[in-house]
Amino acid sequence: AANVFIGMVESPLFIRAYLAKLSRSELFTVMTAGMATVAGTVLALYAFVLGDVIPGAAGHLLTASLISAPAAIMVARLMVPETAAPTGGGELPPTPYESTMEALTQGTSDGLKLFLNIIAMLLVFVSLVALVNIVLSALTPGDRAPWTFEGMVGVILSPLAWLCGIPWAESSAAGALLGKKVVLNEFLAYLDLAAASEEALSDRTRLILTYALCGFANFGSLGIMLAGFGTLVPSRRNEVAELGLKSILAGLLATCCTGALVGLMSTAGLIG
């Protein structure tokens, strides 16, 4: 529930005392929920970007996050089924701090460490994407437009866009937006969505993509998540890294399920 309003790093703080005890499936569910939603702090920015092409953009984006939260749980449980006993709430462990001042200083130190780790991981993942694009550009034959990693991912995701209810004629452009969202981030994808011509994308397709793009499932967010969980629960750093790429896929599938639902409602005349 917290993921709908705050970020993927802040929301696990609500259950920090239980992070080390979560089963593998529960941990993956927490990761997927972070990938399938966006923080309330950026909703206003995205609504401003889409305001001219999507009537009531703010309401659609908030609804997208609300619907994608249960969708994330569904997809996560299907991809990593529960095999252990569910983690109960129980009693919180006693606080390790003996005074308010000790808690304040330790919290400040942990916060700074978390911030620096996030910055470092984000730089590394963005740099890796840039490096791949440089290599692909050098391998591009003839006078063709330079190949990019996000472009290739977009081609792969075109059938997924079609499964969301987007017409096949528009699936290539929609897949390109999904690819940009996964490789780079959803903000750049929303900018392209707002700039797309009416000939390229119909109003219904724009509405579906508004929901399908509304999530943090991208490589930069993976770096942020690895840094965040690595600081909050160091004992499970390797497990989080193993589940990282799978959580991006799960988050993308969750938002696409939301987009498909909106597409069905639009076809039935219930929305749009």
Task: Annotate each language-model stretch with its function.
Residues 57-75, 207-215:
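Alpha-helical transmembrane segments
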Residues 36-48, 64-80, 121-134, 157-160, ...:
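Hydrophobic core segments of alpha-helical transmembrane domains in multi-pass membrane transport
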Residues 1-50, 174-261:
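Alpha-helical membrane segments and immediately flanking helix-loop junctions
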Residues 66-112:
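Long, contiguous bundles of hydrophobic transmembrane helices that form the permeation core
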Residues 109-198:
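Transmembrane helical segments that form the transport core of multi-pass membrane transport proteins
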Residues 97, 101-105, 153, 171, ...:
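Alpha-helical membrane-protein architecture signal
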Residues 25, 107, 111-122, 243-251:
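Loop-to-transmembrane-helix entry motif
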Residues 1-14, 84-103, 149-153, 177, ...:
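Juxtamembrane inter-helical linkers in multi-pass membrane proteins
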